[in-house]
Amino acid sequence: LIDQNTQKLMTMDVSYTIVTKPINGIQELKLPLIQDTLTNYHYLRVLKDNRIIFGGEDEAFGGELDYDKANKKYLSLLKNLKKMFPCFEDKIEIEYSFCGLFASTTNNLGIIGKSGRDNIYYFLSCGANGIINTFCGVDILLDLFSSKSNEFEKYFSPQR
C-alpha cells in the first residue's frame, strides 16, 4: 500500500519489555511513570496489581528476531530494574517478557499520504513523538479526506 519512497524514510527498531511478578510494597512508592533517557532508554510503569512493566534497550532491527539476543536483553533489563530498586532486589522476578518492532523516521515525524488505491490513506511511523504526531496527523488526514490543503502536510509527506 505504500511506495518505496515512504519505505526509505522509515527505520525499524526492536524494543524489549519485561513484566515482573507482583512485588509487595511497590505501590507504596506511588510511582506513576519513569523514563530514563540516559541509559539506553528505559521506562517503567507500576501496575495496580503490584507488577512493574520495564522496557527499553531499543536497537535497530536486523531483519530477523534473534532469540538469544532477546533473552540477553531481558536479563539486562532485570539487572537494571534491580539497580533502580535495591530495596526490592530480592523480590523482583520476571513473569513475562516480550519484544516488538516499531518504525521511526530520522526527524521523528510521521508519514502521511494517499495510497495508489482509491480512498486509502496512511499515517505511519510516529516514532518518539507519537502523541504530537497523532494530533497533527488527524488534522492533516481530515483535510486530505475533504480535499482541503493543510499547511503541515509538506512536513509529513513521503516526498519530503
Where are these regions (language model features)?
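Conserved FAD/dinucleotide-binding core of flavoprotein oxidoreductases
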Residues: 1, 11, 49-83
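Flavin-dependent oxidoreductases
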Residues: 1-47
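Structured core elements
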Residues: 17-19, 43, 53, 93, ...
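Generic beta-structure capping elements
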Residues: 21-23, 57, 115
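Short, catalytically relevant binding-site loops at active-site mouths
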Residues: 25-26, 35, 59-62, 101-102
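Short acidic-glycine loop/turn motifs at beta-strand connectors
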Residues: 47-50, 116-117
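C-terminal catalytic lobe of FAD-dependent flavoproteins
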Residues: 62-68, 82-160
